[in-house]
A protein has these predicted regions:
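Walker A (P-loop) ATP-phosphate-binding motif of ABC ATPase nucleotide-binding domains
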Residues: 4
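Hydrophobic positions on the alpha1 helix immediately C-terminal to the Walker A/P-loop
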Residues: 18, 22
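Phosphate-binding/switch loop-helix module in NTP-utilizing enzymes
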Residues: 70-122
Length: 136
């Protein structure tokens, strides 16, 4: 059975930083790292949304934004389901097939609005490969 590790904690504690450092170390050890990360979108010092990045292709999409017109509302943000599926869920699905380590940063209320994302996470957890992620 493969190792599955999810980090949790309050916002800003360093979950994503730890995952990023481990992923970089694995790349230095010649492992293929795939999956997705998320990060802040800022306008000046104000957070206006979140981006989502495919670690294998470096494709970036908008996970959620204050100016997103449609989609599920989580706090002051609306989730961009199209980018969540196209970038996030696809990144995880590709990692299940092609990576040595699957990164899922993060699983939270925004990501869980997508059935395709949830299916991709389930596939990752059941594929027998190591998974490293964060939980909101």
């Amino acid at each position: 059975m493969a190792l599955v590790v999810f980090l949790t904690g309050v916002p800003g504690v360093g979950k994503s930083t730890v995952v990023g450092l481990v992923a970089e170390k694995m790349k230095l050890d010649s492992l293929t790292v795939g999956g997705m990360t998320s990060g802040d979108l800022r306008s000046g010092s104000a957070r206006v949304g979140f981006e989502i990045r495919n670690l294998m292709t470096n494709e970036v999409g908008v996970l959620a934004h204050v100016n997103q017109a449609t989609g599920p509302k989580i706090g002051k943000y609306r989730v961009n389901g199209e980018d969540l599926d196209k970038v996030g869920a696809e990144a995880i699905s590709s990692a299940v097939k092609d990576a040595d380590l699957i990164v899922i940063d993060e699983v939270g209320p925004m990501e869980l609005t997508s059935a395709r994302f949830k299916d991709a996470v389930q596939a990752a957890l059941g594929c027998g490969k190591p998974v490293l992620g964060t939980v909101h």
